[in-house]
Amino acid sequence: MSFTNTLRKLVHRKSWEYLAPLPLVNANGSFLVSDKNNLTPNSIIFYISNAASIFRYDGDEDSWLQLPTSGIAGAFGLGACGEFRGLGALGGVFEQVATGGGLDTINTNRTIVRNLAGRRIRVTSGLGIGFDSTIVSNTIGTNAIITVSGGTTFDATTRFQIFSGSMWFQNAGASAGFAVYDIATNTWTAKTAVGITWGTEGYLIATPSSITPFASGTVTAGAATTLTDSTRGWLTNQWANSQVRITAGTGIGQIRTISSNTATVLTVSSAWTINPDATSEYSIEANDDYFYLLGNNAVTLYRYSVTSNTWTTLSPGSVRSGAPGAGCSGAFIDSASTWVLNSDGSPNLLTATGAGVYKQNGRYILSFRGGNTNALDMYDIALNTWISSIEYGNRNEAFSTTANSVDYKGDIYIMKEATGRINKFSVDDWAHKSFTFNPIPAGVNISGVKLAILPYEEGGESFAYLYSMYHTRQDFLRMLII
């Protein structure tokens, strides 16, 4: 069944729908995290009421289910935050190691407790590298065996990823912990903590690859640590810290972090197992390995590597000119519709402020500074630098304690403290705009992300719902975004 979205602004009025209420009244630090990119077929929102009370909302059913307690270190409260990833984190990692296999079967040492049929699986190294399809079936319980179709053989050298979903959680307080909940195994795994007392406000920001590639092409030459496309005209280092994937031909399936680039050559951070050549095709994507953590009323920005389970305190070329305080935000911009590259792969200039800002999806984290200011700062992932206090349309209103936000396809939806107003920052229009009003009376004003997005896609058409909880209440609502 297909549909055509004929809803139009002004003609059709946005309207809230009441949903099944939150299982518990929210409190300081309580937050929502959702599969806003529809990477798993479940329409999931996670409600982290506190470190011990965590719930899953199924949009398809309008119902809640309690999940296992996190066991995370720290003291839940101001600054607690999280992020959803489409990749499963079985055992706390994205890349899984097969223990054996055969024709269309992969043996694992994981205890998978649910049916993963229909979930995407891709092989990243070893026997079967380049395989990218869906799971046909799996056994339940210890040492689960995964079955696929297509006639590919796997063995103990096979490394693979499953798009079964995971939720990453940064706690607050002294000795604040960091942990991940994996859906396939229904298990929490403690990860390396950032190692500081965390509070005030916080945003954990992922850079997932599986939205839309930012660029693609055919290789004209390859070497141990390089990939050349002589048809390109990239800006120097515009793709640094993104990842490149070989999608066809020699070396298919390999993924590497891009350490630098010239106009026509990508240099990767570690040598190829098989050098790409003129038969190879590639795509440039967001880097699956990284999370960024900002907030804590400090200019310091942290980056977490899933592969190494380590945190890096970044040293930007230009430091952020003001600390992100109460009411700050953080959004990875990867799908602005008007940020289209030129035919040679180079981006267009948005503003010459600082090091220059380019209309390039996947390059920037946008962050309203909060702290009762209206400053908008941008972190340039490629150049590891901040561009501070950038001008934008309708700049006036300040964001303060309990303002919070969620981003979706180039728009940032911002709850304006406990005013009831939800505004929108449009990347395409580069302007702060009004959007809607939540009529529910606020209880005690509290911190934490209270907005989430769930999209619906079918037959090439799509639309999305904005979900909202409010201050110290159990009410839960949604609105169709028009």
Model-derived features with residue positions:
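Enriched but not universal
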Residues: 1-17, 21, 470-482
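Conserved short beta-strand element of beta-propeller blades
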Residues: 19-49, 54, 67-90, 163-171, ...
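Short loop/turn segments that connect beta-strands within beta-propeller blades
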Residues: 58-62, 182-186, 305-309, 380-384, ...
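Autoprocessing Asn-cyclization modules and mimics
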Residues: 88-159, 163, 181, 191-196, ...
